[in-house]
């Protein structure tokens, strides 16, 4: 039987991804005791799990370094890779939103400056609305940008909204709801079809899809 290689995003989705695999009967003991290992074999289930940073999951899948991956829809929208997105896994739910200072009197304003970790998503959103904006790419806490005058608004993931409120910010507009997704390499789906299809069906049954 072919071994299926699956990439899991480090960070907020990792624990829930492992729980999903456990819920369909996969022995995830080696994942729980992996220490600093980045590649963990699950020989009983003919799986190999690779832990990578979330933005890298689409790249690993697209180039066939792994057969499939679990990653947030936010990453997929930003990366825009050629992948099969086969399942909404129904966890890691949050929203992409436009937010700014509670003291901002008018939204939107002409030629806004937009701070974000997701420049492609922000650009596409405002272009679709015919709004001219300047995108300012950031890596750190984007909430800081409106507070110090770097940007008028931010585009970011919002879960509870607590961080925004604590920093005097509010949501002006929601862009899209996001959640964890299962994505496949197109070639792998053909060459390992039976094994991958079986795994997809087990996950789909558990997630109700």
Swiss-Prot record:
What pathway or pathways are given for this protein in its record? Amino-acid biosynthesis; L-histidine biosynthesis; L-histidine from 5-phospho-alpha-D-ribose 1-diphosphate: step 1/9
The protein's superkingdom reads: Bacteria
A molecular function (GO) held by this record is:
ATP phosphoribosyltransferase activity
Q: Which Gene3D superfamilies match?
A: Periplasmic binding protein-like II
Into which EC class is this enzyme placed? Answer: transferase
**Entry GO terms, CC:** cytoplasm
Record keywords: Amino-acid biosynthesis, ATP-binding, Cytoplasm, Glycosyltransferase, Histidine biosynthesis, Nucleotide-binding, Transferase
Q: What this chain does, per the record?
A: Catalyzes the condensation of ATP and 5-phosphoribose 1-diphosphate to form N'-(5'-phosphoribosyl)-ATP (PR-ATP). Has a crucial role in the pathway because the rate of histidine biosynthesis seems to be controlled primarily by regulation of HisG enzymatic activity.
Subunit structure, as described in the record = Heteromultimer composed of HisG and HisZ subunits.
Task: Tell me which family the UniProt entry assigns to this protein.
Answer: Belongs to the ATP phosphoribosyltransferase family. Short subfamily.
Task: Report the protein name in the record.
Answer: ATP phosphoribosyltransferase
């Amino acid at each position: 039987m072919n071994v299926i290689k699956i990439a899991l995003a480090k960070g907020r989705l990792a624990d829930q991804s492992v729980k999903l695999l456990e819920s369909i009967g996969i022995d995830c003991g080696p994942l729980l005791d992996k220490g600093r290992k980045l590649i963990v074999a699950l020989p009983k289930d003919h799986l190999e799990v690779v832990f990578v940073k979330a933005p890298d999951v689409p790249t690993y899948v697209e180039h066939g370094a792994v057969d499939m991956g679990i990653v947030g829809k936010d990453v997929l929208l930003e990366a825009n890779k050629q992948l099969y997105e086969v399942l909404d896994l129904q966890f890691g739910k949050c929203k992409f939103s436009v937010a700014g200072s509670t003291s901002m009197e008018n939204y939107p304003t002409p030629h806004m400056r937009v701070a974000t970790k997701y420049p492609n998503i922000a650009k596409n959103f405002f272009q679709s609305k015919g709004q001219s904006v300047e995108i300012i790419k950031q890596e750190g806490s984007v909430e800081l940008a409106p507070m110090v005058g770097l940007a008028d608004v931010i585009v970011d993931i919002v879960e509870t909204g607590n961080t925004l409120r604590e920093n005097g910010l509010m949501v002006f507009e929601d862009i899209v709801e996001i959640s964890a997704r299962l994505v496949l390499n197109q070639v792998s789906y053909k060459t390992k079809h039976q094994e991958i299809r079986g795994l997809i069906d087990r996950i789909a049954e558990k997630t109700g899809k």
